[in-house]
Amino acid sequence: MAGNSIGQFFRVTTFGESHGIALGCIVDGVPPGIPLTEADLQHDLDRRRPGTSRYTTQRREPDQVKILSGVFEGVTTGTSIGLLIENTDQRSQDYGAIKDVFRPGHADYTYEQKYGQRDYRGGGRSSARETAMRVAAGAIAKKYLQQQHGVKVRGYLSQIGDVTCELKDWEQVEQNPFFCPDIDKLDALDELMRALKKEGDSIGAKVSVVAESVPVGLGEPVFDRLDADLAHALMSINAVKGVEIGDGFAVVTKRGSENRDEITPEGFQSNHAGGILGGISSGQNIVAHLALKPTSSIMVPGKTINRQGEATEMVTRGRHDPCVGIRAVPIAEAMMAIVLMDHLLRQRAQCGDVNSQVPRW
């Protein structure tokens, strides 16, 4: 099965299934001498971890990460870092009744068609459980970015259904289970989640992620543009159906005179481009938005077929998120951090000696 790795200089390869023995990943390209402990990774894993609030799946996984290699006496050695998380709260019996039925809106049908078989227990490899390892690897990238370059990557929930959340206060993001920066919207979000739980339905969401203090010059035209690699990485997250960089699709209705980011001796006057021009970072904040579909694992009956092609009805039982976008915030941060670290290492290798005299802000 191909497609399990991302990155060139900083490369992450994940393995494992939702109901398998464990999840793991190999992280290549981490420079030596970076202080790193399991606690450095655990913080973000705890933010993504299931069963932490009544608004997410009640599958309870401790997600305790183990560093197997690549770290000695508390610092990275420059060799491959092996990471492992054991699965401890699988309930495979919840899926026995649907092993021969394709859940509508899931990867069951396409996996069966592609491989001729599938792990029906919780979606197997297609499950968002896999993203735990992305978050662990992303935590390494986030620490490197912050420590070596002063780059901070953080995200927030910007919309669930019709409830929009403005970026009013970064501090609020970690103070509520929605990762919402707008305290005035918490009651509306709570009411929406309660209604969905009662109805047995789900809802979509929008997540925003921002990288601050990104150096100028990251990105490799033309096919490895920074925004192209970010879109690739963010679109690879389960349930993501759309990615915007900067103003994204809003540029369709704008004139060039208002959309361009004008430059003065003091710097850029706006950031409609989301910190990327011509596929290369401009030194401004890099801004991306993700649209996540509502999960199809719901109690509302839906039409489908079985492996014999016979019509049947599906009601998904088990433990699922009414809104997968909530736990996607640390995943989006991780994927942006992985891409930025990869491009920083690539920039250092190719253009580390370049010394442009053009002003930077």
UniProtKB/Swiss-Prot annotation:
One of its GO terms (cellular component) is cytosol. Its EC number is 4.2.3.5. The keyword NAD does not apply. It comes from the Bacteria. Reduced FMN (FMNH(2)). One of its GO terms (molecular function) is FMN binding. Pathway: Metabolic intermediate biosynthesis; chorismate biosynthesis; chorismate from D-erythrose 4-phosphate and phosphoenolpyruvate: step 7/7. Keywords: Amino-acid biosynthesis, Aromatic amino acid biosynthesis, FAD, Flavoprotein, FMN, Lyase, NADP. InterPro entries: Chorismate_synth, Chorismate_synth_AroC_sf, Chorismate_synthase_CS. FMN binds at residues 125-127, 238-239, 278, 293-297, 319. NADP(+) binds at residues 48, 54. Its cofactor is FMNH2. Pfam families: Chorismate_synt. One of its GO terms (biological process) is chorismate biosynthetic process. PROSITE patterns: CHORISMATE_SYNTHASE_1 (PS00787), CHORISMATE_SYNTHASE_2 (PS00788), CHORISMATE_SYNTHASE_3 (PS00789). It catalyses: 5-O-(1-carboxyvinyl)-3-phosphoshikimate = chorismate + phosphate. The keyword Lyase applies. PANTHER family: CHORISMATE SYNTHASE. This reaction introduces a second double bond into the aromatic ring system. Belongs to the chorismate synthase family. Homotetramer. This is Chorismate synthase. It comes from Pectobacterium atrosepticum (strain SCRI 1043 / ATCC BAA-672) (Erwinia carotovora subsp. atroseptica).
